[in-house]
Amino acid sequence: MRAVIQRVREASVTVAGEVVGAIGNGLLILLGVCHTDTAEDVELLAEKIAQLRIFSDHEGKFNLSLLDVGGAALVVSQFTLYADTRKGRRPSFTAAARPEIAAPLVDAFAAALRARNIPVATGVFGAMMQVALINDGPVTLVIDSAELRLPRRAGSRVDS
């Protein structure tokens, strides 16, 4: 399970001209589900995001979590996060979970955040959506549940 999280002042998602989800201060979470993801990935990622200290304290340091600031989350499913662009000019999405597997896991992820007392708004799974946001910072991170399982010394997927 892969999430692109953006710290926002506000964000909304529109489907067919109607706003279906909106938040104020918090995180926009673009969520991709891999064909190997399970409920364990849901819990691992939800816990990490809920506790991640990416909001500034009174000294301007990243010391506060989404929970600490009373922020909300806007969760938008996005299978394109599992695009494979290594070959050709058209991305392949074979690593992305099929909708019948992905949709329940996206719902479970939103529920896992709610269970941690985070207000959650969502997009519509499988719909063409327009996402609007005002970045705060900007602060944007990519978190992958598979990487969260690696030993800390294993390094990241991209060497600097």
From Swiss-Prot:
Gene Ontology cellular-component terms for this entry are: cytoplasm
Give the highest taxon in the source lineage: Bacteria
What's the chief localization of this chain?
Answer: cytoplasm
The EC number(s) attached to this protein equal 3.1.1.96
- List localization entries: Cytoplasm
InterPro entries assigned: Daa-tRNA_deacyls_DTD, DTD-like_sf
Q: Which reaction does it catalyse?
A: glycyl-tRNA(Ala) + H2O = tRNA(Ala) + glycine + H(+); a D-aminoacyl-tRNA + H2O = a tRNA + a D-alpha-amino acid + H(+)
Q: Which GO terms describe its molecular function?
A: D-tyrosyl-tRNA(Tyr) deacylase activity; Gly-tRNA(Ala) deacylase activity; Ser(Gly)-tRNA(Ala) hydrolase activity; tRNA binding
Keywords attached to this Swiss-Prot or TrEMBL record, sorted alphabetically, are: Cytoplasm, Hydrolase, RNA-binding, tRNA-binding
Give the enzyme class: hydrolase
Q: Give the location of motif Gly-cisPro motif, important for rejection of L-amino acids in residue numbers.
A: 137-138
Q: Which GO terms describe its biological process?
A: D-amino acid catabolic process; tRNA metabolic process
SUPFAM superfamilies found in the cross-reference section: DTD-like (SSF69500)
Family of this protein? Belongs to the DTD family.
Domain comment (free text) = A Gly-cisPro motif from one monomer fits into the active site of the other monomer to allow specific chiral rejection of L-amino acids.
Q: How does it assemble?
A: Homodimer.
Q: Which NCBIfam families match?
A: D-aminoacyl-tRNA deacylase (TIGR00256)
Q: What does this protein do?
A: An aminoacyl-tRNA editing enzyme that deacylates mischarged D-aminoacyl-tRNAs. Also deacylates mischarged glycyl-tRNA(Ala), protecting cells against glycine mischarging by AlaRS. Acts via tRNA-based rather than protein-based catalysis; rejects L-amino acids rather than detecting D-amino acids in the active site. By recycling D-aminoacyl-tRNA to D-amino acids and free tRNA molecules, this enzyme counteracts the toxicity associated with the formation of D-aminoacyl-tRNA entities in vivo and helps enforce protein L-homochirality.
By what name is this protein known?
D-aminoacyl-tRNA deacylase
Could you tell me the gene encoding this protein?
Answer: dtd
